[in-house]
């Protein structure tokens, strides 16, 4: 993610005075903002070391699930700038279209972070640490778990010598539909239809690990459909009263 953010900052006309990926020894003592984009497990140590001698400067981190308060007691001005997107080094992204979620230690600092965020994205939102944790959790379901299902599908196809490419039109249409429909309304397949014979036959083709995943996912689809239908019925009943 850091590489893509760096490109976006440069394209927006910002002067990047230093990039430090391995060591903080060459980190300048003065800059308008220090952006810490490291893995979550390293963030606390990086903050502690980066802030030394720069306690009056503005620091932000980019982690979706980590608290802004990691900076508390280390520096005076701090915040979060979280781009919600999946990043891979060899894939270009349009940063202007990526939603950025920000928060800050105080109102003046918020305005500085907001200006920085607005310069690289058209979609900037204020969000607290508590709410951002749920946003990041939702992203894990929508992106990480979904991609894992692609990997499982690729394994199933490979058993019969079929290329993963045959899934791409299906994957693309599934993604397009949720631009217009609620995900539950867009759900198709044997689980949402309650076709138990098909589910039993398909799970029998799988090893124990995949069969367990298959049945858990199928039960979740059925439960979600039932919950969604009940909620919609209550809403419709309320409108008729």
PLM-predicted stretches and their roles:
Residues 1:
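Hydrophobic/small residue at the entry helix of a nucleotide-binding pocket
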Residues 42-43, 67, 108-109, 148-149, ...:
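Short phosphate-engaging motifs
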Residues 5, 12-15, 92-179, 236:
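Internal alpha-helical scaffold of NAD(P)-dependent oxidoreductase catalytic cores
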Residues 5-10, 14, 22-92:
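Rossmann-like NAD(P)(H) cofactor-binding subdomain of soluble oxidoreductases
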Residues 165-241:
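NAD(P)-dependent Rossmann-like dehydrogenase/reductase catalytic/cofactor-binding core
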Residues 64-66, 85, 106, 171-175, ...:
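Glycine-rich beta-alpha junction loops
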